[in-house]
């Protein structure tokens, strides 16, 4: 259990275990320093497999041991919060250049014959909508589409470079944390600079503050997020070098600090770019939407509906779920519309196709609201398990939990999905995958069980935490037009005199989301090229197609 900051292992009924010198998982007790775990001699089993000695041991197991684990997780989280505020990179528009360093270890090499070409294919190139929908998109296209062309990052792949030591030197856990991962990042940067592939590293300082905006490291082999029992692997994460207590590397007058990293492999296969998009989104300012405090939780948050939860893994990470309206609004890519009076909404598009989110705000507490959006069956939504109207709940009185990456370390959570069928099954890997993914199909409105309304008295209901009179802003007659990929509904009873339909989010004039590209991704402008050849054309709806200009 855990994340990049603190991880530990426990039995299915919550007893902490640790690996002893013989390689057995035994019950653990905290040391006197309150920071390190000590092994007992009792080998751990799940409840149905325990013998008498083990059961007797657990009868006397100190009741405060689990609380100590949670306290330690909280201490580490607070320490990381004090050091790291999500969102070092403030550039959310334009075409910033971001270095991506491919890293091999002395004992583990990247598996592809030509890894640089492979990562340029997965990260850097423009992709058509058709390619996106069959899992052949790219990280570049992901951010272009989420931003409606406002943000077109230029990922520059460097390497591979080979580090001096094996992966375990950098990844072995000490008291639940990767001990030397910072050294991996510094060494990777130093070796990348030494290759002289980049003639001027200052091009990566897009805001001219003397720091490379962000550097991304992709390391060979598996990550501990996929194989948590293998404690010598590295967790994908985003952090700062200075907060690892290391001197900042420097090249061409700029220093390196903010970084992200993730693994090449995911359970035996080359991973797509979902985790890459997740970690890079941390650099841009998005938090995790799962619990980050080490506590067990059966509370449904954003789950597979958000890139910042399980949604990064859709289609083996080759078709990560698109940004939710809340996430796009934070980036400044869309501006949600608040519904305040009786309105009929017709043919509402997804935010990927130019629509926007609709906010329904608690009149008593403006920081508590619902945000609704359309999930269609195209582009990055193609892999979604449900389609129709998706409703998210938000209650953020302060942005501190967002910046400190503790958004959903509360019960109830601050940001979560409303399941239309009222089935909020949480994922337990290896136990209930089929039930979990089946339940996601019922999260959107109208649900498979026929629920087409969201009111103070519906199931689920439009509940609020602040106020006694309820939300009093019902959504009724919710429908989804599969052919159009749009949603319609009545707000507060609807109104023939107040109809909202097909609103398109504001876009930059003549951005790279519209117009013509060369096949290598260079934007040529909005006028059709005159030189014969094959080009990519993106229309005002963000859809791309190949064209041929003949002599």
Model-flagged regions — what are they?
Residues 1-254, 353-498:
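Zymogen propeptides/activation segments of proteases
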Residues 17, 275-278, 514-515:
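A residue-level detector for well-ordered beta-strand positions
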Residues 205, 209, 278-285, 518:
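Acidic active-site catalytic centers that drive phospho-/nucleotidyl reactions
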Residues 214-384, 395-397:
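Extracellular hydrolytic enzyme modules, especially secreted metalloproteases
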Residues 499-551:
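C-terminal outer-membrane/trafficking sorting elements
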């Amino acid at each position: 259990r855990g994340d990049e900051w603190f991880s530990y292992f426990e039995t299915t009924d919550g007893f902490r275990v640790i690996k002893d010198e013989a390689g057995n998982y035994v019950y653990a007790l905290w040391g006197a320093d309150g920071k390190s775990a000590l092994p007992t001699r009792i080998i751990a089993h799940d409840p149905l497999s325990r013998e008498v000695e083990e059961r007797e041991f657990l009868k006397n197991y100190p009741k405060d041991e689990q609380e100590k684990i949670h306290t330690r997780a909280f201490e580490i989280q607070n320490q990381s919060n004090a050091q790291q505020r999500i969102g070092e990179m403030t550039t959310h528009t334009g075409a910033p250049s971001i270095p991506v360093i491919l890293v091999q270890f002395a004992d583990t090499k990247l598996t592809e014959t030509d890894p640089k070409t492979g990562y340029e294919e997965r990260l850097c190139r423009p992709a058509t909508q058709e390619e996106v929908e069959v899992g052949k998109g790219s990280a570049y296209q992901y951010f272009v589409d989420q931003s409606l062309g406002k943000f077109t990052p230029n990922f520059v792949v460097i390497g591979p470079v080979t580090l001096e030591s094996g992966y375990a030197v950098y990844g072995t856990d000490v008291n639940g944390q990767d001990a030397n991962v910072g050294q991996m990042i510094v060494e990777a940067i130093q070796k990348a600079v030494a290759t002289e592939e980049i003639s001027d590293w200052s091009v990566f300082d897009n805001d001219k503050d003397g720091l490379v905006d962000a550097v991304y490291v992709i390391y060979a082999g598996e990550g501990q997020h996929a194989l948590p029992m293998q404690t010598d692997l590295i967790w994908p994460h985003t952090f700062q070098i200075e907060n690892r207590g290391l001197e900042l590397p420097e090249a061409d007058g700029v220093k390196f600090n903010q970084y992200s990293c993730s693994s090449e492999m995911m359970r035996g296969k080359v991973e797509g770019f979902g985790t890459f998009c997740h970690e890079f989104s941390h650099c841009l300012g998005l938090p995790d939407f799962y619990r980050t405090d080490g506590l067990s939780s059966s509370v449904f948050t954003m789950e597979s509906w958000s890139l910042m939860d399980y949604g990064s893994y859709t289609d083996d990470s080759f078709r990560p779920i698109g940004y939710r309206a809340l996430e796009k609004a934070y980036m400044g890519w869309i501006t949600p519309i608040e519904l305040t009076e009786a309105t009929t909404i017709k043919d509402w598009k997804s935010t990927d196709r130019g629509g926007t989110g609709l906010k329904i705000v608690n009149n008593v507490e403006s920081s508590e609201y619902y945000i609704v959006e359309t999930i269609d069956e195209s582009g990055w939504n193609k892999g979604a398990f449900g389609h129709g109207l998706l409703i998210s709940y938000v209650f953020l009185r302060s942005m501190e939990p967002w910046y400190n990456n503790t958004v959903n370390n509360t019960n109830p959570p601050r940001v979560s999905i409303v399941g239309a069928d009222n089935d909020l099954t949480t994922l337990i890997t290896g136990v209930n995958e089929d039930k979990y993914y089946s339940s996601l199909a019922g999260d959107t409105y109208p649900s498979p069980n026929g629920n087409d309304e969201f009111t103070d008295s519906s199931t689920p209901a439009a509940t609020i935490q602040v106020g006694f009179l309820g939300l009093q802003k019902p959504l009724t007659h919710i429908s989804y037009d599969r052919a159009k990929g749009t949603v319609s509904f009545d707000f507060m009873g609807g109104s023939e005199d107040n109809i909202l339909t097909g609103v398109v989010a504001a876009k930059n004039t003549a951005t790279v989301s519209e117009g013509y590209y060369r096949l290598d991704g260079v934007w040529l402008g909005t006028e059709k090229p005159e030189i014969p050849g094959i080009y990519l054309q993106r229309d005002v709806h963000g859809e791309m197609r190949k064209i041929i200009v003949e002599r």
